[in-house]
UniProtKB/Swiss-Prot annotation:
Quaternary data: Forms a complex with GatZ.
Full protein name: D-tagatose-1,6-bisphosphate aldolase subunit GatY
Alphabetical UniProt keywords: Galactitol metabolism, Lyase, Metal-binding, Zinc
Organism field: Escherichia coli O157:H7
EC number: 4.1.2.40
């Protein structure tokens, strides 16, 4: 079985002191880059998609691609629902074969967040599907969900324990100063808060908004308990900029098998760097 849940991946990372990167993909080419690079480096990775990605590519198509590529490379892969908010949508995708879910109800008041997440956990655990949830809110935009920086708030360590115990989640996404998108200047991450959360919660912790973070910051968060690192914008930027550059330099290009190669190469460099930063090479 090559398509797996993230639970064992993240538990192994927690014990081993490294992190598993979750790369947001959008199509065949971006998935090829992630899987081929991970297989070459023998690194565990998570293939993540927002609701918009699953709508764009099709749930059955993405599942078929992940399954086929995992078997081809003899490399275990997890396909993960990133920032999904609707129970019915999650349930449908789980029944289709998805084995890892993030239910994002972080915009709701604390008690309602617990209630919404627990409903998803109770359903997903019947299918051996791992569940991630978020406490606190990141600024920036992910798919159609936009959070003003002024409305973002950090995870409360004591609430984090209550939240984890009340919901039964398998991993917890925390807000410690990162944001979705790229940073205009280096963010000031609250490492002390992360250390306190780690003392209150023994679950694998997840860091969203890692695009553009320094190697030093990523590795410090891993030392303090982060087991999953989410990267999306940095991949899109590398891919799209290289594609634009190629087409500008080669306006006669019409064959996507040719003009997509430079985009894939640029994205591959980012994937390789993130795997190195996470310390997960050779851990698959």
């Amino acid at each position: 079985m090559y398509v797996v849940s993230t639970k064992q991946m993240l538990n192994n990372a927690q014990r081993g002191g490294y992190a598993v990167p979750a790369f947001n993909i959008h199509n065949l080419e971006t998935m090829q880059v992630v899987v081929e690079t991970a297989a070459n480096l023998h690194a565990p990775v998570i293939i993540a998609g927002t609701p918009g990605t699953f709508t764009h590519a099709g749930t059955e198509n993405l599942l078929a691609l992940v399954s086929a590529m995992a078997k081809h490379y003899h490399h275990p892969l997890a396909i993960h629902l990133d920032h999904h908010t609707k129970f019915d949508d999650i349930a449908q995708k789980v029944r289709s074969g998805v084995r890892s879910v993030m239910i994002d109800a972080s915009h709701l008041p604390f008690a309602q967040n617990i209630s919404r997440v627990k409903e998803v956990v109770d359903f997903c655990h019947r299918f051996d599907v791992s569940v991630e949830a978020e406490l606190g809110q990141l600024g920036g935009q992910e798919d159609d969900v936009q959070v003003n920086e002024a409305d973002a708030f950090y995870t409360n360590p004591a609430q984090a324990r209550e939240f984890a115990e009340a919901t039964g989640i398998d991993s917890l996404a925390v807000a410690i100063g990162t944001a979705h998108g790229m940073y205009a200047s280096a963010p000031a991450l609250d490492f002390s808060r992360l250390e306190n959360i780690r003392q209150w919660v023994n679950l694998p912790l997840v860091l969203h908004g890692a695009s553009g973070l320094s190697t030093k910051d990523i590795q410090q968060t891993i030392k303090l308990g982060i087991c999953k690192i989410n990267v999306a914008t940095e991949l899109k930027n590398a891919f799209s900029q290289a594609l634009k550059n190629y087409l500008t330099e080669h306006p006669e290009a019409t064959d996507p098998r040719d003009y997509l190669q430079s985009a894939k190469s640029a994205m591959r460099d980012v994937v390789s760097k993130v795997i190195a930063d996470c310390g997960c090479e050779g851990r698959a």
